[in-house]
């Protein structure tokens, strides 16, 4: 019988979400990273895709260090013959043509810069153009003598078989042991089809999918026990496997491969109904966005990404001097407020992106002394009506100082929650444009 997770709330959907957040954050997540703020990272995927070598990676990492980033993550393309997505999966040994000093040499150079090093893997998958497949063609999920569906040019390894799990465990453990790795992003970029195991009898084929996920859990268990300090992030073409079972092993999940800030408002708003902020992978990416070709302000991209694990997925060397200074300020802001946002605060949804043009949410400390709120306007409008942003979760009798942009006001909690504060509108369409956002910091006054 499948397990069910249920909570009770007498404070509406925000109360329900906070109960889930505390349950998962305090009781489901394990180890070193339970109730621990996340490092600010830079991932090279949208900066380079498969086209990189050691020099290019080190140049990106050097710039990341300059702006205050703490963790550099090397994504897909570092192993086997992985120069595109047609080949290489299953061969978990370094591509020496790209990285002549190996992952061990690269990770040491990254650490010498003062950064931690992270690595992307997709351990459950295999390409037919790989040494792994050529040696073990029967390790694929799929019936013999029938067509084996591929997706992204890849196939699923049969993790219902212990020898497959053992092989992958030995392969990736060797890479980790030889290197200095602080973070692993574990991806899964296709669904399972034709669920037939060539290692099981006809009578046991109905157990294949269940035994497969038990094999995934087994590999996670062995890796997390052997390498307890590594921060694991799960991923499945984004958030396709965002569930409590995975959070037990990996305390954060890449929420979506869609990194567009406007889309992320809906994605992160919806995810927040059940999953805590600290579990939601969120990055500032380049513009035009690589998924939608939409351009959003750098400030808005950060203002959305703050409410997650926070990081960057772009080549900082391509930014202007002004943008670099803005990124430095963003990193400083997140370092100052990440304990509140990710670990110590309660999350409140205020305005739904599914119900109008505006989105708003906030995080309030348990003692109600501090809060950070985000407001996002999707499309600019001519002669838009006046509106007030009404905060939630504050102490009605407490005097607060609210800061945003170059403005500041003082008001009691009941005023801020029931009357709210006016939202600045750009009535002449001269400055804000589409996808404008405002970040508010709220602090109790003595």
Predicted features along the sequence, with ranges:
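Conserved, mostly hydrophobic/aromatic
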Residues: 42, 72, 110, 168, ...
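Flexible loop/turn segments at secondary-structure boundaries
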Residues: 9-12, 48-51, 79-85, 124-129, ...
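C-terminal beta-sandwich/jelly-roll accessory domains of carbohydrate-active enzymes
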Residues: 379-446
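Short Pro-Gly-centered flexible turn/kink motifs
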Residues: 1-10, 435-442
